[in-house]
């Protein structure tokens, strides 16, 4: 089975190499690069990356490389959204860290049935030792909980801090939610 998968992956990469990178990467290279800088320099992300590297299994391309890619792209989307709204650098930094945490952990239980639910529960436990406030941990929990494609999502009550209405991680909705709540007394950033 692994040989078949390896051949399929190799062929898929050959096909992809024939085409230019998606416009997103060209049009938003500043955001991708800035997100990568946050990813590579933030101590919370560095510590979480070490944890994920030790605990994630590669499951048909959903291993560490995939988690890093999702985290960096999530951060880029957050940067784009925040630039449009005009939030402060401090607030942007915190949002980027939160979505990058969600990106790193979103497939931590990938090999399990109902991996989004189990992964969200696992992430909630793991993140208790990180310098994140309870609301931030809950935001990460709900992003992971609702990320799985082709599965129904749980409608998140506004009091639970995160609105997701899709079958996979919708970083733009996380951004929109934070944008609405940035000045709310409910949001507390360290």
Which residues does each predicted region cover?
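Post-HEXXH active-site segment of zinc metalloproteases
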Residues: 114-126
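Beta-strand segments within the central parallel beta-sheet cores of soluble alpha/beta enzyme folds
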Residues: 136-145
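Active-site alpha-helix of zinc metalloproteases
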Residues: 98-102, 143
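Active-site-adjacent bridging/hinge elements
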Residues: 41-50, 95-98
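Generic alpha-helical secondary structure signal
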Residues: 43-47, 69, 139
């Amino acid at each position: 089975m692994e040989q078949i998968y390896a051949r399929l992956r190799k062929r898929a990469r050959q096909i992809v190499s024939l085409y230019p990178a998606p416009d997103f990467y060209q049009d938003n290279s500043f955001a991708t690069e800035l997100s990568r800088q946050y990813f590579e320099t933030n101590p919370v992300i560095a510590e979480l990356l070490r944890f994920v590297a030790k605990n994630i299994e590669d499951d048909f391309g959903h291993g560490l490389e995939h988690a890093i890619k999702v985290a960096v792209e999530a951060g880029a989307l957050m940067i784009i959204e925040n630039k449009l709204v005009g939030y402060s650098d401090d607030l942007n930094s915190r949002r980027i860290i939160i979505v990058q945490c969600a990106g790193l952990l979103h497939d931590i239980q990938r090999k399990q049935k109902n991996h989004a639910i189990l992964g969200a529960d696992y992430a909630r436990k793991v993140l208790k030792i990180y310098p994140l406030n309870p609301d931030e941990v809950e935001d990460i929990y709900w992003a992971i909980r609702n990320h799985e494609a082709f599965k129904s999502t749980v409608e998140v009550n506004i009091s639970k801090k995160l609105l997701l209405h899709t079958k996979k991680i919708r970083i733009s909705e996380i951004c929109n939610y934070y944008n609405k709540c940035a000045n709310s007394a409910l949001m507390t950033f360290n």
